[in-house]
């Protein structure tokens, strides 16, 4: 499957922006007419794949859903760009916006503040801590400022891509029921099972019973399924049902926080913070790849 050069618009905890895992997932997406992501997050995969006849993005996080709705709207997008481009990189603004964005009723202003936080949060962990650079620089300015300024170069591509996508804000159960049948492919990237990682990171967690319910729903889903996450005993029914599973070794950037400064580490982090991502496919997804 040919990928586009459009990137996800912001870092997202547990997202699939890592080039290695993204390439692996894109390579396993079978042919489809219709496409749905029940756990959309930063939309790394959706934005990077070729467009399908019908595409559905869903997330229960109202902040990220409002952001994508604003970016998809031609009038709102221009206003968003004009406002966001004026903002400097500032810890005070980061903290202020972290307190105030949920109470903003203007969708454009809420999206601007939400995006500011998402772009500058360390490790994609929304509003948990400010991800700043102390001594590193790029393009004649600090890495933090350079990254913020460079993020606007990608947004017009995101705008063009997301305009054709149906944006939902609903429970994953409802989404899987509504968007299924002949020609559908569901790519699911739920929050990692709690027992496979340290606590925190997600604003909307899934409990073990939710993961069990998800697996049960995917086993009877009418369509092709590709699922990503860390392997867990909760996912054992997939192997029993004959689903294919592939493993990809990646670096967990969110684990790179140094103990003393709270900043992202380098070097030893890459040596010691390895994670094994799993990608599962159901029989229908595998059948389509063979045809």
Name each region found by the language model.
Residues 52, 71-74:
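A short linear boundary/processing microfeature
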Residues 1-56, 60, 166, 170-185, ...:
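Class I S-adenosyl-L-methionine
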Residues 68:
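Conserved SAM-binding loop
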Residues 1-22, 28-31, 43, 74-201:
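SAM-dependent nucleic-acid methyltransferase catalytic core
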Residues 65:
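Short alpha-helix immediately C-terminal to the canonical SAM-binding loop
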